[in-house]
Amino acid sequence: MLDTTANDEVQALLDTFGAALERGDIDAATACFQDECYWRDLVTFTWNIHTSEGKEAIAGMLRSQLAATRPSGWKIAAGESAAEEGGVTTAWIEFETGVARGYGLVRLMGGKIWTLLTTMVELKGHEEHKGFNRPLGAKHGAGKHRPSWKEEREAEARELGYSRQPYVVIIGGGQGGIALGARLRQLGVPAIIIEKNERPGDSWRNRYKSLCLHDPVWYDHLPYIKFPENWPVFAPKDKIGDWLEMYTKVMELNYWAKTTCKSAKFDEKTKEWTVVVDRDGQEVTLKPKQLVLATGMSGKANVPTYPGMETFKGDQHHSSKHPGPDAYKGKKAVVIGSNNSAHDICAALWENDVDVTMVQRSSTHIVRSDTLMDVGLGGLYSEQAVQSGMTTEKADLIFASLPYRILHTFQIPLYDKMKEIDAEFYAGLEKAGFWLDWGVDGSGLFMKYLRRGSGYYIDVGASQLIIDGKIKLAHGNVKEIVADG
């Protein structure tokens, strides 16, 4: 019996799958999948972010979308090879549809598809102006009264939103809105980003003094311009703010700072939005076809209310308004909460000679930064990963390829290992009285983030202060705040 390579196995399956799709045979296409199977589609088939779980759901999606999608050319991606580990064969793939070029990741078990990720790389006829298609920039030849690049940009800034309407308005000018604006710019789509702060990057600059990123640099690249090789692994907030401001300029984004949205209404007849904004005191009406809300998941302060707050004689504020520790030197402070911001603020207060107490109202998941980087992220987001050929784009797609239904099964063993590596650390926290948890199923940080968006701390030093009793600890919900504290 002849041995078949992993490449042969994957390509044979793709040939069968692709042929079934091309002839519209949905039964034959779904027969290429395991009984337990998942197809995560990012735009290519569904024009949405959609996960189909099981053969029946996949068949339903194909009945709805296959005729319009017209997929073809399924093959292992150029320059890639399939790999087998633990009974699972994985391969990067590429394909086309009637209107787009696609890329994806397939996992086979027993010769059939277990998970399939399909993503849209580019629309045919609307390719980005980069690489061989990059703009020339200089206008060679001669012509009278030609505007310079600077004059063209100034004219665009004067006209867009006034004499000429944007196709897209993005509400929110943090990193998400900025990255989307950059993508649209490269596609030639007129867009305006509106942001309430005075400058790009202020959503970072305005946070508490000691804030640094808790994710590593390899996790944080923006499209087109990667952070330089000497960029710190965990960048401080003001450095990030400056980078975002630079990025909006060099990527030629139409960024309206000091602008707030007053109202937005969609007209079903004209299929356009009427968006009224206040631009630095001037009311402007925009008429985009598309409106995007990029206001962030953690930007709005969740401010609790307690009896007696109005009588308290000292300073009180939410972490989003925390000015830093300098004004509190030699005083006592209470920080209500036990997640990332609370730990960072407590540590900075202790460093500046403040007698600080953390009030822990419920259990918190804690993972040491070094261990998380090594065990949890090292294979995808690290210098070692880069040296092995991993890119941020591929790492992101690997994460995206795992449906939430099974993502926890990949995470639990990692956090079991972290728990074992840092057993002494966790014993110290428990001895100090800190309430720990590992998520509802022991799957740790990422699942807790996806499920709740909170409830965790990536330890960069504050936990040891709790273990040592330097940050005091109190438990339970706040009953009342008294005038004298």
Model-found features: residue ranges?
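Exposed beta-sheet edge and beta->alpha loop/turn motif
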Residues: A83-E127
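Conserved Rossmann-like nucleotide-cofactor binding loop
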Residues: G176, E198-R199, S341, T364
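Glycine-rich active-site loop/strand segments that organize a redox cofactor
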Residues: R205-D242, S363-A432
